[in-house]
Amino acid sequence: MSIRSNFVRLLKKQVSIIKLQKKCSHSVAVIGAPFSKGQKRRGVEHGPAAIRSAGLIERLSNLGCNVCDFGDLHFSKVPNDELYNSIVKHPRTVGLACKVLAEEVSKAVGAGHTCVTLGGDHSLAFGSITGHAQQCPDLCVIWVDAHADINTPLTTPSGNLHGQPVSFLLRELQDKVPPIPGFSWAKPCLSKSDIVYIGLRDLDPAEQFILKNYNISYYSMRHIDCMGIKKVMEKTFDQLLGRRDRPIHLSFDIDAFDPALAPATGTPVIGGLTYREGVYITEEIHNTGMLSAVDLVEVNPVLAATSEEVKATANLAVDVIASCFGQTREGAHTRADTIIDVLPTPSTSYESDNEEQVRI
């Protein structure tokens, strides 16, 4: 990296720090999305409750955030929701759920909140990103996941819509996505250069073809092993924020982590992110000062073998979200107004009683 590049990066970081100092108190909207019809496994609808029970609201409040908990959305199951093309499951139900979520996220972002959506399965990201884009059309997306979720309704091997949301979001893929029931309201809101994947390690053949043929940026676990997570984040920001600052939407699937850390999820894949890598991603996103919305999805308490596995996965989800809003690994810092900025000085009498003094 050249001296000029280092200088520009340092300057941008200083500008971001100034932005964060000016906005020391985030206004955060938390929206629960207890939805499971984008996949086949029971239990992911309990994800929002598990994450809340792990202390999310208290953690954000302790970080100085002004938290507005919007509660959980209600999603209706559409009767007679038949398969599309003999394979795509629950298209009308998923389409309606995404529409409901899009409206709620749009309201929250429009009211000035940074929006946190608790899933629920990853099909919901079509709704959250669409709603975000209604208020911030120039947004960019960082998609942290073991899977690319970019199959189309014509390439999906499973028929599960949680493996397809990105194909609905990208303008370049619209001639490949048929008009399926339940999605007549939907419009693509991203270009391929607006999204970067991190943590991929389980791609279907069609997904691999799409990523390479359309030149969509991604960093697999092999890339992370070879380059290191620091370099991955630098390249991610160079692409998404290199020319201008713009809102970031982070869509984080808990299965991006190794199953040893996040066992309570529906599609675990061995060889995932470490705790340090995952939290470094969110810490760096926070440091840009540009985070505008977060999805945390696919926590499934029912699939855990023990209550300890539920607790570990939910606690990890809370750490991911909290580090998006300033939680650091440098100590338990809380509200900015409680941070000590002047060290106490020993009194004269105290000093006289002690022959050996160590001065700071």
Curated annotation (Swiss-Prot):
Its cofactor is Mn(2+). Keywords: Arginine metabolism, Hydrolase, Manganese, Metal-binding, Urea cycle. Mn(2+) 2 binds at residues 145, 147, 253, 255. GO terms for molecular function: arginase activity; manganese ion binding. GO terms for cellular component: cytoplasm; mitochondrion. The keyword Glycoprotein does not apply. It comes from the Eukaryota. Binds 2 manganese ions per subunit. Pfam families: Arginase (PF00491). It is an enzyme of class 3 (hydrolase). Substrate binds at residues 147-151, 158-160, 204, 267, 298. Mn(2+) 1 binds at residues 122, 145, 149, 253. This is Arginase, non-hepatic 2. It comes from Xenopus laevis (African clawed frog). The lineage of its organism: Eukaryota, Metazoa, Chordata, Craniata, Vertebrata.
